[in-house]
Design a protein with these regions (language model features):
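Extracytoplasmic copper-binding redox domains, predominantly the cupredoxin/blue-copper superfamily
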Residues: 2-180
Length: 180
């Protein structure tokens, strides 16, 4: 379980400046701490692993624009897999992907009801923003191996089929940073 320790910071409300008829009640998901101080949307990854189960290359992940937010807020995937960006809202959105280093990945416009499929070609943390609605963001953590998990509402995670060995556990969170 990934838990928060200390005094929980008060998150400011998101500044909804456009499309207010659709973009109501958008939560600030940059730090969600649930029951028992569990942190949601942290990505737990094994480091130093060189063998084990093969990456499922045909896997397709979905990131939806729904209620003027990206759902899910954080996802993890492998190099070689795909993300389908979907727009379930009745307004235009974009999915502009940048590595946290600032290096661009792609930028697609998503009209209502449209989808766009993009490959994940480089490992790292990718921030997704909507250029039309600047409060919208999500993250994709792209790994070269399948030994990772995104924490749930209780801060819990599960990584299956770990081969015997000694590994480091790395935890990444958009607000709290990285811990090993």
């Amino acid at each position: 379980t990934v838990k928060f320790e200390g005094k929980l910071p008060k998150l400011p409300p998101l500044q909804i400046t456009k499309s207010k008829e659709v973009c109501r009640n958008v939560p600030n998901e940059t730090l969600i701490v649930g029951a028992g101080q569990g942190i949601r949307y942290a990505v737990v990854t094994l480091e130093g692993i060189t063998k084990g189960v093969a990456v499922e290359k045909e896997a397709i992940h979905e990131l939806d624009n729904l209620g003027c937010r990206f759902v899910p807020h954080v996802l993890a995937a492998n190099v070689g897999q795909f993300v389908v960006f979907k727009n379930s809202d009745p307004i235009l959105h974009t999915a502009h992907a940048l590595f946290t280093s600032g290096q661009p990945q792609f930028n697609v416009g998503l009209y209502p009801g449209k989808v766009s499929r993009k490959p994940l070609v480089t490992p790292g943390v990718v921030k997704i923003i909507c250029e039309v609605h600047p409060w919208m963001s999500a993250y994709i953590v792209v790994s070269e191996h399948p030994y990772y998990s995104v924490t749930d509402a209780y801060g819990e995670y599960l990584i299956n089929d770990i081969p015997a060995g000694n590994y480091r556990l790395k935890v990444w969170h958009e607000t709290l940073g990285t811990e090993e």
